[in-house]
UniProtKB/Swiss-Prot annotation:
<dbReference type="GO" id="GO:0006729">
    <property type="term" value="P:tetrahydrobiopterin biosynthetic process"/>
</dbReference>
<dbReference type="GO" id="GO:0003934">
    <property type="term" value="F:GTP cyclohydrolase I activity"/>
</dbReference>
<dbReference type="GO" id="GO:0006730">
    <property type="term" value="P:one-carbon metabolic process"/>
</dbReference>
<feature type="binding site">
    <location>
        <position position="76"/>
    </location>
    <ligand>
        <name>Zn(2+)</name>
    </ligand>
</feature>
<dbReference type="InterPro" id="IPR043134">
    <property type="entry name" value="GTP-CH-I_N"/>
</dbReference>
<dbReference type="InterPro" id="IPR018234">
    <property type="entry name" value="GTP_CycHdrlase_I_CS"/>
</dbReference>
<keyword id="KW-0378">Hydrolase</keyword>
<feature type="binding site">
    <location>
        <position position="144"/>
    </location>
    <ligand>
        <name>Zn(2+)</name>
    </ligand>
</feature>
<dbReference type="InterPro" id="IPR001474">
    <property type="entry name" value="GTP_CycHdrlase_I"/>
</dbReference>
<dbReference type="Pfam" id="PF01227">
    <property type="entry name" value="GTP_cyclohydroI"/>
</dbReference>
<dbReference type="InterPro" id="IPR020602">
    <property type="entry name" value="GTP_CycHdrlase_I_dom"/>
</dbReference>
<dbReference type="InterPro" id="IPR043133">
    <property type="entry name" value="GTP-CH-I_C/QueF"/>
</dbReference>
<comment type="similarity">
    <text>Belongs to the GTP cyclohydrolase I family.</text>
</comment>
<keyword id="KW-0862">Zinc</keyword>
<keyword id="KW-0547">Nucleotide-binding</keyword>
<feature type="binding site">
    <location>
        <position position="73"/>
    </location>
    <ligand>
        <name>Zn(2+)</name>
    </ligand>
</feature>
<dbReference type="GO" id="GO:0008270">
    <property type="term" value="F:zinc ion binding"/>
</dbReference>
Length: 193
């Protein structure tokens, strides 16, 4: 989806004027262009195309944990950010680990809500691996909630649990044990930014 940067720049100028600012003053003169460039970068997930290469024949649990992501809330255009944890049981094929990170980026770098993003990641992991046994957990802080409204930055946790992970409680618990060191509260403590 190509972004119309000229329209974004015009809209940002109008917003600046609407709040009583002078878009030509020092410090704001380049803001419309910077905002357009920012949206182009933050929304690059719409242009994601990926071919998947399968590697080894495997059946053991695969977990990629603590994948950092940034997204934009579609309701307020404010960031939400956090970590994603992806687990799946291969059905004879394993995709490259970097592909899992790219899938998270594909769906986080869009106007989003966390619930839909988590489901989309799980769907794509299932499609890419050919496995119905997928578990995706996302943990995020939403600035639309932290900076406005209730003004509370409590993390939101969303899980998409499919296949064996739904049926086998011990398997689900194993994933939670594996991801524990990479949970959002620990990542933030280690400096997310």
């Amino acid at each position: 989806m190509p972004i119309d940067k000229a329209k974004i720049e015009k809209a940002v100028r109008m917003i600046l004027e609407a709040i009583g600012e002078d878009p030509e003053r020092e410090g704001l003169r380049e803001t419309p262009r910077r905002v357009a460039d920012m949206f182009e970068e933050l929304l690059e997930g719409y242009d994601f195309t990926e071919e998947y290469t399968w590697f080894t024949e495997a059946t053991d649990l695969v977990v990629v944990s603590g994948i950092r992501f940034y997204s934009l809330c579609e309701h307020h255009l404010l960031p939400f950010f956090g970590v994603a944890h992806v687990a799946y049981l291969p059905r004879g094929k394993v995709i490259g680990l970097s592909k899992i990170v790219r899938i998270v980026n594909k769906y986080s770098r869009r106007l989003q809500i966390q619930e839909r993003m988590t489901k989309q990641i799980a769907d794509e992991i299932s499609k890419a691996t050919g496995s119905p046994d997928v578990m995706v957990i996302t943990e995020a802080v939403h600035l639309c909630m932290a900076m406005r409204g209730v003004r509370n930055g409590a993390p939101t946790v969303v899980a998409a649990v499919r296949g064996e992970f739904e049926r086998d409680q011990s398997l689900k618990e194993e994933v939670y044990r594996i991801i524990e060191p990479h949970r959002l509260s620990r990542v933030i403590a280690l400096s997310f930014f």
